[in-house]
């Protein structure tokens, strides 16, 4: 731990905050139907696509129609991607001659990319053809991100409108998210990545001669284009098995900075756009502040834990100045490895430049806990915002109980119907995480996949289901997850974490949109003050995190105590 490391982290966060307002204003303009600098180019294309699809942009949908359209679209995307993965041996652009994926692996992978999880039970450079990567996985990187943005927009309109029966048009929101936001930013970022040395080619591989004269075959492919949307869409699935630790995905410290900035840009700007669209920028900044408090605390915790190192190694006389460098790339160092670890799990990206299974017990506890909080720091593109709004609803309800008034948020009364749906959404994650983890912890077939015994083995299981249900996608890689049990149950967990959460959220949006927007009075609890920020942070920790404490005590916490006693697993 050094002042230079803290300076790197501080500079990174400062750059992120500089992008929030301009990008947030642009997003608000796009989805409020205002003219932007891209409108002359993309406006005619948008109208053409909607006309071909038979979509009337002026015809809006109620919450149920919006929800059914979202579910139908994602079901079609799942079937299309499943078919591509199963049939890739017969499809073009397969220079490696890869066979089709097995049914359970194709099921897992298709759900993974449709739900924006990008959990990968396969090695990309050894299992997925160029066609599967480009026409299958990369396409879903765009569509899953656009789906999250669309749901977030529907929730935003619920607070912006008064006595309304509609939330917008799902097809229009999807089209605009892709055309005006994801595609332009991805094109620019992909070109930047190519300039930085990330390959973009249809060649299968290149043969290199090592220093000792041996021949080595290095996989290639359309990497830069996939890397761009992987980060901007908070997808996280890598072209290579090593993900952003691979030099062809993340060749330098500068590219590492761009990767982190890209993964944070849209999801943070959406919170600002929320404030702009509901007519209260103070609310947007309050939500950003609550996210920043927890995310910065997570970064600091990982950095401190990893630079402290392993006391068993220190007792053997190893140099303490390096800390725990196992599983880390020296071109990034401790500070940026810690920042990437906390941010990728707080954001629901799931890409890694550090192997999370090699973190110290407390260092590994932090990313696990950040996912369990609900992926709202600031979470995935779109999904983080609507997840954060659920916790805002819970927070004002608790505040209302304390002062004896009907809770309100942004002029909308929060009543029994909204609370029921909010609690239903909040209970989805612990049900999927703890339920499947408990079964896997006693099932012989599941236990056979463990790479480590003791508390770390339990942590591997817990992290896998946490990552799947939280739609994150990162892993403790000691778990061999490419089995029928894990492919199936993790796939179910991913679907629950995405759709069983989104449906109650859209139901809340429909209920709130129909209500008349009231004006604030002297007795209204203000939701843009430091008091609200503190209460929101407390509710997130209590309701989002403490329900997992018994499981964490048996996993990473027990492993940490054992490490202090001289035991490793």
From Swiss-Prot:
Localization terms from the record: Cell inner membrane
GO molecular function: P-type potassium transmembrane transporter activity; potassium ion binding
Pfam families in the cross-refs: KdpA (PF03814)
Cited function: Part of the high-affinity ATP-driven potassium transport (or Kdp) system, which catalyzes the hydrolysis of ATP coupled with the electrogenic transport of potassium into the cytoplasm. This subunit binds the periplasmic potassium ions and delivers the ions to the membrane domain of KdpB through an intramembrane tunnel.
Superkingdom of origin: Bacteria
Keywords from the UniProt entry: Cell inner membrane, Cell membrane, Ion transport, Membrane, Potassium, Potassium transport, Transmembrane, Transmembrane helix, Transport
Family: Belongs to the KdpA family.
Source organism of this protein record: Allorhizobium ampelinum (strain ATCC BAA-846 / DSM 112012 / S4) (Agrobacterium vitis (strain S4))
Quaternary structure annotation from Swiss-Prot or TrEMBL: The system is composed of three essential subunits: KdpA, KdpB and KdpC.
Name of this chain's protein: Potassium-transporting ATPase potassium-binding subunit
Any single Gene Ontology cellular-component annotation: plasma membrane
Membrane topology: Multi-pass membrane protein
Stored NCBIfam families: kdpA
């Amino acid at each position: 731990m050094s002042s230079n490391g803290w300076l790197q982290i501080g500079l990174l966060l400062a750059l992120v905050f500089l992008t929030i307002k301009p990008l947030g204003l642009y997003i608000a303009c796009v989805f409020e139907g205002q003219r932007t600098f891209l409108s002359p180019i993309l406006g005619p294309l948008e109208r053409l696509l909607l006309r071909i699809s038979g979509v009337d942009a002026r015809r809006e949908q109620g919450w149920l129609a919006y929800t059914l359209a979202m579910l139908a679209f994602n079901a079609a995307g799942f079937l299309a991607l499943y078919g591509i993965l199963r049939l890739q041996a017969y499809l073009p652009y397969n220079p490696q001659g890869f066979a089709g994926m097995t049914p359970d692996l194709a099921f897992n992978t298709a759900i993974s990319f449709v739900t924006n999880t990008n959990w990968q039970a396969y090695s990309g450079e050894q299992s997925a053809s160029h066609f599967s990567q480009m026409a299958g996985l990369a396409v879903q990187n765009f569509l899953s991100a656009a789906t999250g943005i669309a749901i977030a927009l529907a929730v935003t309109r619920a607070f912006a409108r008064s006595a309304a029966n509609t939330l917008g048009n799902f097809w229009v929101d999807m089209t605009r998210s892709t055309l005006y936001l994801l595609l332009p930013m991805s094109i620019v970022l992909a070109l930047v990545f190519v300039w930085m040395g990330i390959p973009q080619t249809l060649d299968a591989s290149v043969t290199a001669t090592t220093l000792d004269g041996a021949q080595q075959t290095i996989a290639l492919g359309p990497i830069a284009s996939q890397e761009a949307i992987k980060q901007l869409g908070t997808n996280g699935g890598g072209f290579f098995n090593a993900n952003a630790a691979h030099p062809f995905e993340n060749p330098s410290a500068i590219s590492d900075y761009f990767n982190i900035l890209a993964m944070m840009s849209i999801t943070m700007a959406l919170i600002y756009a929320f404030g702009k669209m509901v007519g209260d920028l103070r609310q947007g900044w309050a939500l950003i502040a609550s996210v920043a408090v927890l995310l910065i605390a997570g970064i600091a915790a990982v950095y401190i834990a990893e630079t402290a190192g392993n006391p068993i190694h220190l007792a053997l006389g190893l140099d303490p100045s390096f800390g725990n460098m196992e599983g880390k790339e020296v071109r990034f160092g401790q500070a940026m490895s810690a920042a990437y670890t906390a941010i990728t799990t707080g954001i629901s990206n799931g890409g890694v430049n550090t192997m999370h299974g090699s973190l110290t017990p407390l260092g590994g506890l932090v990313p696990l806990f950040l996912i369990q909080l609900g992926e709202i720091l600031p979470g995935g593109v779109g999904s983080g915002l609507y997840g954060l709004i659920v916790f805002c609803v819970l927070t004002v309800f608790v505040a209302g109980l304390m002062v004896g008034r009907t809770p309100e948020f942004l002029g909308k009364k929060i009543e029994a119907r909204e609370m029921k749906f909010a609690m239903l959404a909040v209970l989805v994650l612990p049900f999927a995480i703890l339920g499947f983890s408990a079964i896997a912890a006693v099932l012989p077939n599941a236990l056979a996949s463990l790479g480590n015994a003791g508390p770390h083995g339990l942590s591997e299981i817990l992290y896998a289901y946490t990552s799947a249900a939280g739609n994150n996608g990162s892993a403790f890689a000691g778990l061999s997850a490419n089995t029928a049990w894990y492919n199936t149950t993790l796939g179910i967990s991913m679907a629950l974490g995405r759709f069983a959460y989104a449906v109650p959220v859209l139901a809340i949006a429909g209920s709130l949109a129909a209500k008349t927007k009231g004006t604030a009075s002297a007795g209204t609890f203000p939701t843009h003050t430091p008091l609200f920020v503190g209460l929101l942070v407390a509710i997130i920790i209590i309701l989002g995190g403490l329900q997992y404490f018994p499981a964490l005590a048996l996993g990473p916490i027990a492993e940490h105590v054992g490490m202090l006693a001289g035991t490793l697993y």
